[in-house]
């Protein structure tokens, strides 16, 4: 895989290599969020913002301290922090370990409505 990832310019910084928002990991599914973030870093992403269930935050901060960690909002809670993260991102990933329930579907609809990133 190394041959597919270009060498980095020594004068660059992590912000030069893209900002990824990952919305992943329902309660008890921290591993899915962790592996999604790890994959983003390993494929060259410079900055990762990881939004997961609040029960996962301590685990994720320990496993992948270089990521910016956010608590996933419930639909009826304040959505503003996630909206800011969506605007911040160059690209986003939604879904690993999120489940298939109505709350996940509603959150996905909001993300798709607000998102502009691929």
Please give the residue ranges for each predicted region.
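Small-residue (G/A/S/T)-rich helix-start motifs and N-terminal tracts that mark the onset
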Residues: 1-118
